[in-house]
C-alpha cells in the first residue's frame, strides 16, 4: 500500500510538497532536490509524516 508523505524544505521556509511512497520497496527516508518558490532555488526536501 502506498502511504502519503510530506516533503519538507530544508531551507527552513515551511514550504512542502505531498506525495505517496511504497514503504515496502523503499523503507528509508526519502530525500529529493526540488524547487522552493519561497527562496526561488532548488533545495533538498526531506520526508516527514503528515499529521
Swiss-Prot record:
Family, per entry: Belongs to the bacterial ribosomal protein bL33 family.
NCBIfam families recorded: PRK00595.1, rpmG_bact
Keyword check for Ribosomal protein: yes
Name of a matching Pfam family: Ribosomal_L33
InterPro entries per UniProt: Ribosomal_bL33 (IPR001705), Ribosomal_bL33_CS (IPR018264), Ribosomal_bL33_sf (IPR038584), Ribosomal_zn-bd (IPR011332)
Cited PROSITE patterns: RIBOSOMAL_L33 (PS00582)
Protein name: Large ribosomal subunit protein bL33
Record key words, sorted: Ribonucleoprotein, Ribosomal protein
Gene name of this polypeptide: rpmG
GO cellular component: cytosolic large ribosomal subunit
Organism expressing this protein natively: Nitrosococcus oceani (strain ATCC 19707 / BCRC 17464 / JCM 30415 / NCIMB 11848 / C-107)
A single BP term in Gene Ontology: translation
A GO MF label: structural constituent of ribosome
